[in-house]
């Protein structure tokens, strides 16, 4: 068996074992493709054992807001309680995903980092003034949605969150817990 084929088969075995233990690892940027994979896994677990807990482990630099909110909405729709665990990094939309679990179910590993900020538009935007105005209004609506998530999750005031996300705000796991983004630090997955 060629080495590449063997590694692919090994990855399939690992993925199967993780799904059997009701763990989903989201270890990549938030894209339409990564969101679709996460949603498929969530629904597979929901359909095979509705209401049974799921652990959603996040290590993501962030990415697409729309793709991230697609995952968020699915987690909120299923009956299975989801626990989020940040390991490594949850930045930007990754930090928003870490908050989709119910209060008391949001954790990080000791050396995890979380970064929150306001949304941005990448690349160059060109077009008519009215089109640019439409884009500007849309990003402000997106910013308001993200602020709402942080306010609800942390219990902080809207003013505190607006100030916090004005620029990139980096936090250790302990700092994120003090800010209200996390409910605890995990030293062992046996603690779940």
From Swiss-Prot:
Enumerate the Gene Ontology biological process terms.
Answer: protein quality control for misfolded or incompletely synthesized proteins
**An annotated Gene Ontology molecular function:** ATP-dependent peptidase activity
Q: Which reaction does it catalyse?
A: Hydrolysis of proteins to small peptides in the presence of ATP and magnesium. alpha-casein is the usual test substrate. In the absence of ATP, only oligopeptides shorter than five residues are hydrolyzed (such as succinyl-Leu-Tyr-|-NHMec, and Leu-Tyr-Leu-|-Tyr-Trp, in which cleavage of the -Tyr-|-Leu- and -Tyr-|-Trp bonds also occurs)
Gene Ontology CC entries for this record = cytoplasm; endopeptidase Clp complex
Location of the active site = 92 (nucleophile), 117
* Keyword Cytoplasm annotated: yes
Q: Sorted alphabetically, which SUPFAM superfamilies does this protein's record hold?
A: ClpP/crotonase (SSF52096)
Q: Where in the cell is it found?
A: Cytoplasm
Keyword vocabulary terms for this entry: Cytoplasm, Hydrolase, Protease, Serine protease
Gene3D superfamilies for this protein: 2-enoyl-CoA Hydratase, Chain A, domain 1 (3.90.226.10)
The record's section on InterPro entries has: ClpP, ClpP/crotonase-like_dom_sf, ClpP/TepA, ClpP_His_AS
Q: What is its EC number?
A: 3.4.21.92
Name the PROSITE patterns for this protein.
CLP_PROTEASE_HIS
Show the HAMAP family listed in the entry. Answer: ClpP
Q: What is the protein's quaternary organization?
A: Fourteen ClpP subunits assemble into 2 heptameric rings which stack back to back to give a disk-like structure with a central cavity, resembling the structure of eukaryotic proteasomes.
Instruction: Name the NCBIfam families for this protein.
Output: PRK12553.1
Q: Write out the function statement from the record.
A: Cleaves peptides in various proteins in a process that requires ATP hydrolysis. Has a chymotrypsin-like activity. Plays a major role in the degradation of misfolded proteins.
- Entry's family note: Belongs to the peptidase S14 family.
PANTHER family in UniProt: ATP-DEPENDENT CLP PROTEASE PROTEOLYTIC SUBUNIT (PTHR10381), ATP-DEPENDENT CLP PROTEASE PROTEOLYTIC SUBUNIT, MITOCHONDRIAL (PTHR10381:SF11)
This chain belongs to which protein, by name?
A: ATP-dependent Clp protease proteolytic subunit 1
What gene codes for this chain?
Answer: clpP1
